[in-house]
From Swiss-Prot:
Name recorded for this polypeptide: Protein MxiC
Function comment: Necessary for the secretion of IPA invasins.
Keyword Repeat in record: no
Main location, first listed in the record: secreted
Top-rank lineage group of the source organism: Bacteria
Subcellular location as annotated: Secreted; Host cell
BP terms from Gene Ontology: negative regulation of protein secretion; protein secretion by the type III secretion system
Matches recorded under InterPro entries: HrpJ-like, Invas_InvE, MxiC_C, T3SS_LcrE
GO cellular component, one term: host cell
Keywords: Plasmid, Secreted, Transport, Virulence
Organism: Shigella flexneri
Amino acid sequence: MLDVKNTGVFSSAFIDRLNAMTNSDDGDETADAELDSGLANSKYIDSSDEMASALSSFINRRDLEKLKGTNSDSQERILDGEEDEINHKIFDLKRTLKDNLPLDRDFIDRLKRYFKDPSDQVLALRELLNEKDLTAEQVELLTKIINEIISGSEKSVNAGINSAIQAKLFGNKMKLEPQLLRACYRGFIMGNISTTDQYIEWLGNFGFNHRHTIVNFVEQSLIVDMDSEKPSCNAYEFGFVLSKLIAIKMIRTSDVIFMKKLESSSLLKDGSLSAEQLLLTLLYIFQYPSESEQILTSVIEVSRASHEDSVVYQTYLSSVNESPHDIFKSESEREIAINILRELVTSAYKKELSR
């Protein structure tokens, strides 16, 4: 289940829908994606409205708690090691904390040796702050170390903390190290690449079969992040991040549409072309619409022995036609791609009829 004790600004129906995504089997990846598919556009709009409402509510929230907070799950969010190993490390740090005052360099070195990721270091220190009978000096020193770790990298640290539970859940589902997923979420929050490049990057890093799951992971991590005591972004930044996520979900919608087109065509039957290769071609068309003909050249060269050119061109034309318009930078770029593809279809049909 989605690890949110207080769903905060989100409706229970929205949280239930997201929990259903996490609990779905691998075979239901396409079904997950279709929750925001252009084939069911009202669902996509509902999701966008929920996110807009969430952002509005986030802006109006009160100041959050100070450094120590009231979290009791700091240790559960640590990703560096198995549970028993983490328990041992935390126990050793607690023992060292009681034996050393003031805290010396050895304590800090041990902390960084045990937990290499800054988010895990902060979580471990917060766990120590929950210890009873700490002196005022110990609290002050632990707080100072936390502030030193966070200084200049607060967004990255908080993003790593807030995505940790989801990284564990999805890491288990995808058979991936949760640290990789945490890095993925950080990259999404802090990165500045185009949404199509982001989708291509995830496709390359996590594989064709996991591409929809990664979008679900990022979405759920973002929800937890926004609803956390110490979010990674301010309201303005979250607005930008939400717009990126919505754009990526539009690309996933196009992905779903395209896969349905491929399933109903003959392009995948002889094995000369892979679904991943064909999807990448579509993504490149979204990025460089004026070069659509050149982008399709490599596909045509491979497919020509088994398929008519018109089948390839028509598949891409109908997919672009049915995809959300805002995938393109402008309506004019979309029209450029459609016009080029339409001309290619017409030309291919004429050649095939003249044989």
